[in-house]
Amino acid sequence: MILFGAADPDDPAHVRSVAYLARLDEPGFYLAGFALIEFDIVMKSRGLNYRERMVRHALLARDYPLTTTRVKPLSPEILYLAARMEGEDRIDYFDAGVAAEAKVLDGHVVSTDRVFDRLPGLKRVW
């Protein structure tokens, strides 16, 4: 996941994650809202308390300010598609959300997760 890769300099995907976040200033590049939700929920599931999560979000905004503005809002259409993809394509909730956002926007997903390769109408970039 790009947000975890960017947040951890020791992560093997750090350099590439930072490079993709830097592209948020390009037309057509956006951060999936579902990616932000997943970032927070995974931190919570790993035992980070609310203050630790607040710090991580503040650092993300400080270090990568475009993550605060280059996020498309979620909509009923995206949530409908995400639910459909989760059930019919049998993919995980967050992957379905990211895929739905990409389908509504332009069909491109920046991810290391190969699940996106098998979804029609999507192109995974990494």
Language model regions located:
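Acidic catalytic patch
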Residues: 9, 33-37, 58-87
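Alpha-helix capping/helix-boundary segments
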Residues: 2, 35, 78, 98, ...
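Acidic, PIN/NYN-like endoribonuclease modules and their adjacent C-terminal/linker elements
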Residues: 63, 71-72, 99-126
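Short loop->beta-strand "edge-of-pocket" segments that line small-molecule binding or catalytic clefts
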Residues: 28-30, 66-68, 108
